[in-house]
């Protein structure tokens, strides 16, 4: 009788285990795994503030996480060439022969580059492309130069030397900035745009008037921190860095003759006039006469491998970045929501992954 009770007890335990297993198997599958997937990325510092702002929301929605180490667009392109990370960002297209055949471009992040300055004036400065080009090319060296004064009537401009700060690393932000200078003021910025400021500089940085006055720093955080600690300085970077560094931001004259602030609406208006190619590249139209276009709007391209082992998670991340709730998660950062033909292109590119 004792053996029979033990046998019955064992059978009951077995039945309980089988029932529990069946109930677990019958549950509908979830889009989230217990641990999720941790994606890794690097590259453009332009992308960092948006990615930071969207990280928690993406995790809550997908169960996945990501880490992004920045390093600059050049570092992102190099990492992509070596097959490092799940995604890498570059603010200019990766057209070099080193790009792997399975890597595609997804222009997923849009925002303005701000021309930022540390100057003791109360009114926001207004600057045209030709004036900005003259400042960064070293032909305008004083804040009260007639070119600046003519655009800022009523502003008490000091007779101080302008200290120019540029990106010393390979930078897509620099590439876009110098493309803008060459595109809108080619007589002054005579060289084509370049990701390397030194090689794209239309003159010599070692002349007596430029040496020590035009200096470099690495990364967006580096140039804005240096500018923030240097009175009478000027630099260029993503808008999100201006406030932290205590910098003012100029309104820039567009091709229609209007001075436009670097905001999301102005960026969207400018990007809407760009030519979008099937390979994911944008060609900006600096001559667009859209009234509120901000002519220093740019995109950052996600460089992704279509054969990624984490294809599903990667697609979900890029889709989340393009969702309006991501660029508007912190409106003060100035990122623009991608819409229209560019959004359609992005969705097509994302569909190629996996």
What are these regions (language model features)?
Residues 1-4:
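Short, Lys/Arg-rich N-terminal segment immediately upstream of the first membrane anchor
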Residues 7-17, 21-354:
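Flexible loop/hinge segments at secondary-structure junctions
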């Amino acid at each position: 009788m004792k053996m029979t009770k033990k046998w019955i007890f064992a059978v009951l335990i077995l039945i309980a285990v089988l029932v529990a297993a069946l109930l677990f198997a019958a549950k509908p599958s979830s889009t989230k795994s217990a641990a999720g997937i941790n994606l890794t990325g690097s590259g453009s510092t332009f992308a960092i503030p948006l990615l930071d702002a969207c990280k928690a929301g993406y995790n809550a929605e997908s169960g996945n996480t990501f880490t992004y180490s920045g390093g600059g667009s050049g570092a992102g392109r190099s990492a992509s060439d070596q097959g490092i990370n799940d995604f890498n960002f570059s603010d200019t297209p990766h057209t070099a022969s080193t790009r792997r055949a399975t890597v595609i471009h997804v222009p997923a992040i849009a925002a303005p580059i701000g021309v930022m300055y540390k100057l003791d004036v109360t009114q926001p400065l207004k600057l045209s492309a030709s004036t900005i080009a003259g400042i960064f090319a070293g032909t305008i060296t004083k804040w009260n130069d007639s070119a600046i004064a003519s655009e800022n009537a009523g502003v008490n401009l000091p007779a101080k030397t302008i200290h120019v700060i540029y990106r010393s690393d390979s930078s897509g932000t620099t590439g876009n900035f110098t493309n803008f200078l060459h595109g809108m003021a080619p007589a002054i910025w005579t060289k084509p745009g370049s990701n390397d400021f030194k090689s794209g500089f239309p003159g010599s940085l070692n002349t007596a008037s430029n040496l020590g006055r035009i200096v470099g720093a690495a990364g967006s955080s580096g140039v804005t921190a240096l500018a923030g600690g240097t009175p009478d300085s000027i630099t260029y970077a993503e808008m999100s860095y201006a406030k932290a560094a205590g910098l003012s931001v100029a309104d820039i004259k567009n091709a229609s003759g209007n001075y436009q602030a670097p905001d999301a609406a102005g960026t969207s208006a400018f990007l809407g006039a760009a030519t979008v190619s099937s390979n994911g590249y944008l060609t900006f139209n600096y001559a667009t006469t859209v009234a509120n276009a901000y002519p220093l709007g740019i995109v950052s391209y996600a460089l992704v491998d279509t054969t990624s082992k984490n294809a599903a998670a990667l697609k979900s991340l890029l889709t989340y970045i393009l969702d309006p709730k991501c660029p508007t998660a912190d409106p003060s950062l100035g990122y623009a929501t991608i819409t229209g033909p560019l959004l359609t292109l992005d969705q097509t590119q994302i569909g190629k992954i996996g």
